A protein has these predicted regions:
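N-terminal amphipathic alpha-helix/helix-capping segment at the start of soluble metabolic enzymes
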Residues: 1-27, 138-150, 207-210, 214
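Active-site mouth loops of central-metabolism enzymes
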Residues: 17-34, 77-81, 152-165, 218-228
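Short, well-ordered coil/turn segments that N-cap beta-strands
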Residues: 19-24, 45-46, 70-76, 96-97, ...
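Glycine-rich, proline-tolerant flexible connector loops at the mouths of alpha/beta enzymes
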Residues: 36-37, 42-64, 181-199
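Catalytic cores of alpha/beta
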Residues: 38, 78, 83-97, 101, ...
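C-terminal helical cap(s) of enzyme catalytic domains, especially alpha/beta-barrels
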Residues: 65, 107-123, 250-269
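Conserved anion-binding
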Residues: 86, 98-174, 185-188
Length: 269
C-alpha cells in the first residue's frame, strides 16, 4: 500500500494496549459540544467514549465528537444500547474507532456485535464511502476495509453473572478485542453493589483477566472501581488491566463545582 492510499487514522488507545501500556479513557454522557474532545486531549487522556446507553446525546452529536477526537489524536469509542447493532454501524460510519457493547452475556451476543462492526471476511459491516477515519479521501476499498478491521475495536462488556460465567467463550470470539468490566453492574449482580474492592469482585476480575490473556485480548476497567485505592488499581494493572475508564463529564463537573463552593465558603467564613 502506498502512502497516497494509506488511511492515516490510527487508534491511539489500541496502540498503547498492544504495547503493554495503560490507556486512560474519559466518558461523555451529557456534553454536546465538540470542545469536550479538546478538553480530554489537553488533560492527557488518549481516548473518550460517548455514552449512548446512559447518556442524553444523539447519534449525530456523537459523530461530531468522534470526528473532533480523530482530529486531535484521541481514540473515539461509543457505547451503544444493548444489542443495538444498527446504531453501532451508524456511529462507526460517523467516525468512531470502536464500539462498547454492553450486557454481553454469551458468545452469541459478542458474535452479533462483531459482525456489525467488522467488514468481511470477519463480519458483515456495510460499506460507506468517504469515512471520517480516512479523512474523506478516495482510497481503494480493499485497503480501507483491511485497515479499519485492524484499527476498529469491539469492547465486550462483562457486567452480569451470565457474562462472567461465559467469559472464556466470549473472549474466544474472533473480532472481540477487549473485555470491558462493568464493575458497577457486576457488583450489583453478584449481590455486593458498590463493594468494588471485595474478594468476590477481585476473583471475578482474576477470571476475566485470565480469559483475556488466554485468547490474546485486552481488559478494560469501567464502573466505580476506578475511584478505589491506588493500591487496588496498581495491583490490577500489574495483573494485566490495560485500560481504565477515568471519570465522566457529569461527575467531574459536579466534583469541581462542589470543591469550588467549599473553597469560597472557607474564604468568606
Amino acid at each position: 500500500m502506498s502512502e497516497k492510499t494509506k488511511p492515516v487514522v490510527l487508534n491511539p488507545a489500541k496502540q498503547l494496549m498492544d504495547a503493554g501500556k495503560l490507556s486512560l479513557m474519559f466518558s461523555v454522557r451529557q456534553t454536546r459540544s465538540v470542545d469536550i474532545a479538546l478538553a480530554a486531549k489537553a488533560a492527557g487522556y488518549d481516548s473518550i467514549y460517548i455514552d449512548l446507553e446512559h447518556g442524553a446525546l444523539t447519534i449525530p452529536e456523537a459523530g461530531q465528537i468522534c470526528v473532533t477526537a480523530l482530529a486531535v489524536g484521541l481514540s473515539p469509542f461509543v457505547r451503544v444500547p444493548a444489542g443495538a447493532t444498527d446504531a453501532a454501524g451508524q456511529v462507526l460510519d460517523l467516525g468512531a474507532m470502536g464500539i462498547i457493547a454492553p450486557h454481553i452475556s454469551g458468545p452469541a451476543d459478542a458474535k452479533r456485535m462483531v459482525s456489525a462492526c467488522k467488514y468481511p471476511p470477519i463480519g458483515t459491516r456495510s460499506n460507506s464511502s468517504s469515512l471520517p477515519q480516512q479523512w474523506i479521501a478516495k482510497m481503494p476499498l480493499v485497503d480501507v476495509q483491511k485497515r479499519l478491521n485492524e484499527e476498529t475495536m469491539v469492547l465486550a462488556m462483562i457486567e452480569s453473572r451470565d457474562g462472567l460465567e461465559n467469559v472464556e467463550a466470549i473472549a474466544a470470539v474472533p473480532g472481540v478485542d477487549v473485555l470491558l468490566v462493568g464493575t458497577s453492574d457486576l457488583s450489583a449482580e453478584l449481590g455486593i453493589p458498590g463493594q468494588f474492592g471485595s474478594d468476590i469482585i477481585m476473583k471475578a476480575l482474576d477470571r476475566i483477566i485470565a480469559a483475556a490473556k488466554k485468547h490474546g485480548k485486552h481488559v478494560s476497567l469501567g464502573g466505580g472501581i476506578k475511584g478505589g485505592s491506588v493500591n487496588v488499581l496498581k495491583t490490577l494493572c500489574d495483573k494485566g488491566i490495560r485500560q481504565i475508564s477515568v471519570g465522566n463529564d457529569v461527575g467531574m463537573l459536579n466534583a469541581a463545582m462542589r470543591q469550588r463552593v467549599i473553597e469560597i465558603n472557607k474564604l468568606i467564613a
